[in-house]
C-alpha cells in the first residue's frame, strides 16, 4: 500500500507521486506517516522531508508551510521546497557560511530574527544534500 504525496509551492509542483512513507518536520517535532495514517492537519517547520520510495530514502528541504493528511493523501503546501538532489553542495555551503556571518553581525531585534531564519534555511539545505542510506 502507498501514499500519494504532493508537495506544492506558490510557483510550482515539486513532487506529485506515490511514496511508501514520509518523515515530516512539524512545529512540534518530526512525524512519520505510513499508509492508513489518521487524518491530521499540521504546520510544517523549516526542515527536512524524508521520502521512502522503492526502499530508498530521498530528501527535500522544506521552508515552512502546512500539511494535510487523510485517506492516504498527503498535501504539503510550503513557501519553498528543493529536492536534495537538486541542491548544489558548494553553493549551499557558501550560503550557510554567509548566513552564519550575518547572524554574528546582526544588530537589532528584527535583523537578528531575519538572520536566524536565514541560517535555519541554509542549514536545512545543507542537511538535505546527504540522503539517508
UniProtKB/Swiss-Prot annotation:
It is found in: Plastid, Chloroplast thylakoid membrane. Signal peptide: none annotated. It is a peripheral membrane protein. It holds the Pfam family ATP-synt_DE. The lineage of its organism: Eukaryota, Viridiplantae, Streptophyta, Embryophyta, Tracheophyta. GO terms for cellular component: chloroplast thylakoid membrane; proton-transporting ATP synthase complex. The keyword Lipoprotein does not apply. This is ATP synthase epsilon chain, chloroplastic. Transmembrane segments: none annotated. F-type ATPases have 2 components, CF(1) - the catalytic core - and CF(0) - the membrane proton channel. CF(1) has five subunits: alpha(3), beta(3), gamma(1), delta(1), epsilon(1). CF(0) has three main subunits: a, b and c. Its main location: plastid.
Amino acid at each position: 500500500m502507498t501514499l500519494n504525496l504532493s508537495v506544492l509551492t506558490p510557483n510550482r509542483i515539486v513532487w506529485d507521486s506515490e511514496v511508501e512513507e514520509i518523515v515530516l518536520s512539524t512545529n512540534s517535532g518530526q512525524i512519520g506517516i505510513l499508509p492508513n495514517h489518521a487524518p491530521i492537519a499540521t504546520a510544517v517547520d523549516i526542515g527536512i522531508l524524508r521520502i521512502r520510495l522503492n526502499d530508498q530514502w530521498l530528501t527535500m528541504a522544506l521552508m515552512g508551510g502546512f500539511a494535510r493528511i487523510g485517506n492516504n493523501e498527503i498535501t504539503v503546501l510550503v513557501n519553498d521546497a528543493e529536492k536534495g538532489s537538486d541542491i548544489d553542495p558548494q553553493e549551499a555551503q557558501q550560503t550557510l557560511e554567509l548566513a552564519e556571518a550575518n547572524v554574528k553581525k546582526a544588530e537589532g531585534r528584527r535583523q537578528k530574527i531575519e538572520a536566524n531564519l536565514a541560517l535555519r534555511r541554509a542549514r536545512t539545505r545543507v542537511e538535505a544534500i546527504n540522503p539517508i542510506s
